[in-house]
Amino acid sequence: MGSRRDAFHTPPAPGCAESPVVGVDACRTGWVAVTLEEEGRFAGADTAAVLSELLGRVPDAAVVAVDMPLGLLAEGWREADLLATAMVAPHRSRVFSVPPREVWEADGYDDANVVCRRLTGQGLSRQSWGLAAKLREANACRDGGDHRLYEVHPEVSFAALGEGRPVPWSKKSWNGQAVRRRLLEDQGIVLPDDLGPAGRVPPDDVLDAAAAAWSARRIALQAARSLPDPPQTTETGLPVAIWY
């Protein structure tokens, strides 16, 4: 690892394997989290409207894996998204390409679309712009100094859980959720029927958070892989990669 990357994202120490880890996914009401205990088993689920509030509730977590782009480039497309798209092929629509930082600094969709075309030659979908608020929120947490945060993508994690094969069914379908839940259970992550308040969150978001937690556990064990390897870096040295 290069010195710039080490300065911001030193790999978890061996002792981190004895600490809980957390996976986080964005949902309609804010954020949902799944925590795994030291041995990688389900320890609890939580939800909050604001990510920083959720992070404050897990001070002992060694790693927090978030399903949200972390690390925005000054120009060009991120290698992480291109590689993740290839990994979940033929379901390429499950991954979106993240344009440069200036796009996300725009005041609204129309301005962001103009900036995106100027910088990349391509437009920005309204669906992608819909992530703007949460993307800014997550990056503010990491840029503000919480370097427990790592970017993950649940579909990449599920593909890894499936020995390189992406789940063929949509995460919102009965078949898709059954397969994803079984893949997690095969790793010892058994989600209970009663999740308390977090049980009000759509099941696909809970499953995504659990997959993120599986990746967080791998990061804590220093067994994770990154797309790309080694990660790209921002101009300030922050890593830009999807971990699984």
What is the meaning of each model-derived region?
Residues G2-F8, P12-V21, A26-Y244:
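RNase H-like (RuvC/DEDD) metal-dependent nuclease/polynucleotide-processing core
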